[in-house]
Structures are given as C-alpha cells and as structure tokens.
C-alpha cells in the first residue's frame, strides 16, 4: 500500500483517523485512569489528536484538489534528483530572446536549437524514465541559480509508430500553478488521458513539455527574469526549446509551439506567448490573472507594471490567446474582461466564461480536451 502524499491510501487513512479519533475520544473520556492531573492530561491529548486528525484531513483534501504538492519531497522542499543524474546545460545556437521584452518572429520563426543528442537504451541522453508511460524527466541548469529545475517530456503514442518515424511533432509547454509542481499535470490534471480523449476527437498528437516554474529556494518569480534572480524566463523559453529540439523529433518553428497553464501558470502562458511571438504561436490561459501577484514584485514595480497583460497586449504580437475562467472565480474572470478590452490586431483573444466551477484542478482537468482542440486549430500539425 502506497502512502505517498497524494495517494488514495493516504487520504483514506487520514480521513479514517479524522472520523475514528473523535469517536474514540468520546468513548474513552470517562474511562481514563489516574489522578486528576493525569486524567486531564490524557483527555487533552485525546482532544488534540482528534483536532489534528481533522485538520490534517482537510489539508490533504485541499492538496489533492488543488495539486499544491505532489509528494513528500515537494512538501518538504527537497529537490528530487538522483545523485548520479546528469544536469543538462543547453548550448543554444541563437541569441537569447527571453529577457522579457516583446519581440517579433524572425525570418523562418525558428526556436533556438542545439546539436542533436543520441538516445541510449531507449532513453534520451540525460533523461530518466518517469513512470513508464513514455514520459521522461531531466534536471536542467537555470541561469543565475545553483538549483536545477525539473523538465518532464511526455510523448504521444504516434511518436513510436512506424508511420511517424521521421515526423516532427508540435509541442505544447505546460505550466503549473504556485505553489505547485509539474507532476500535478500528470496526476490531478490527468493531462495525458485528456490529450488522448482530444486526439480521439481529431486533435493533434502533441509532445508535452512540462517544466518546473518555481526555482527551489527562490521567491515566486512568476516566470519572469528579474535582476539578481534566477533567470526563470530564460529556462522556460530558450532552454526548454533547445532541449526539446536536440533530444526529440519536434518542430522548431513558432507554428509548432504553444503554451498552456493554469492559475499562475495561466498568467505565465499568456505573458510568455505575448512576449515571445518568435517562439510561440498560441497560448492557453486557464484561470490566470492579469499581472504578477507575488509580493516579491513589490521590490520591482517597473517589472510588475511591464508584466501586466494589458501592457503586453499593446505590442500587438501576431499570436492567439485562449483564456477561460469560472464566473465563480472573481479574480480570473475579471482578467478575461481586461483581455478582451485591450486586444489589438493582429493579436487575437478568445475567451470562455464557465457559469460554474472553482479555482481547482478537477474543473480545469475537465476543460483540457477543449483546450487541446483549440490549440490544434491554432498550431501547425505533425510535419515531415
């Protein structure tokens, strides 16, 4: 039986304790033995244990609902890395476009690339197998940080089929929320099954790139390069592109790359798409918001102002944005209004306001097939 933080067994155990301990407290209340002080102490222990079990059960349910922490290492802030693992440092051939300024597609609109890397024993060099579902994990060096970041890559079934042996696949880069973890996409969001369902209805077989957006030990940088801080935007854009291009059969033109994120990752997906039209053609913002909300940005008012989606839309980059929110989620639904108000051609913004739903992964997961269908209509398909 697995007692991982997000496992059903652990949730059942904790909820069971939350039910049993209050009952046990009532039953044992009049049966404790000893002097008055000892009896009082035992009763207090029973009450505290019952209360703690109830609080823990609530926290476990909230964590499983929102995908805040994927496991014990994530909860305790420990970086998951095999001591023998290779930390990839991409060698990018082109200049770094990820400083945060808006750009325009270069001629050909191609992403940064690196020299081809061979596969060894069925694995891309520098990657390890994640869970046996054609999903791989690498640790990647981040400029300005001594802590590497996780990058997961999940391949569609078509990738291994003979008919696609020499084809290049489009990529969707998935950004999680904060606090959160990349593996929330595989568990609470169940993204691989959702993509499979979308493909059954005609959606494109995307390669999924799932990077970590929060640098271990650093403040919440909201996918932005800030002075004297880890350059997380460079990692998410230039480095992720270079690693995918050198390790997998993927498209390197902007028409073959899109972004999707939820909550903070939704803001990041919209902001990075608007900032980097030379890299991305489309972005999906699920329950995001209109500007950096991290208190750390109080130190960087200019960067916070520049990071507002209303400001980024003024540059009118040639990209497409799809934003969705629930009417019962005031912060993200308010951001939809701002997006439609500030958009200018050739930028296009499509919005969807759901009448019901909360700020949680169960609602967002259900929306994913429609999100992949939208991306299929705004990104290029498999080529070669």
Indicate where each model-derived feature is located.
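Non-catalytic cap/lid and distal C-terminal segments of serine-dependent acyl enzymes
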Residues: 1-384
